[in-house]
Amino acid sequence: MSSEKEIQQQLSQMQGQGFDPEAQQRQEAQRQEANERRQGILIQILTPDARERLSRITIVKPEKSRQIEDLIIRAAQTGQLTERVDDAKLISLLEQLSEKTKKTTITMKRRTIEDDD
């Protein structure tokens, strides 16, 4: 009996601290719904080959895939896309994104100190 009381007490403390399981479930449901809408839009915009390529990119680099998806969806919503995005066009978009996000590398050459000992 006391363990049930302790559990209830801990649960009420967590809710008081901002931990609300129902709110988390609602947020998760909203995220899931938004993801389903996003996938539905991509299915309409991308050809099967382009979708397959994008799914392989998602496995390796999810952040790059997300950037490309955002770019494609934004272009479709603003009316910039007049036809479906095929594999060649997706490759072109990937190259453009790679050029924009190239990382600068800095090579440091350290001087060696000659010790007379």
Swiss-Prot record:
Residue ranges of the region described as Disordered: 1-40
Keyword set, alphabetical order: DNA-binding
GO CC annotations on file: cytosol; nucleus
Composition bias type Basic and acidic residues, residue spans: 23-39
InterPro entries named among the record's database cross-references: PDCD5-like, PDCD5-like_sf
Lineage: superkingdom: Eukaryota
Bias (Low complexity) ranges: 8-22
Example of a GO MF term: DNA binding
PANTHER family reported in the protein's UniProt record: PROGRAMMED CELL DEATH PROTEIN 5
Family: Belongs to the PDCD5 family.
UniProt protein name: DNA-binding protein DDB_G0278111
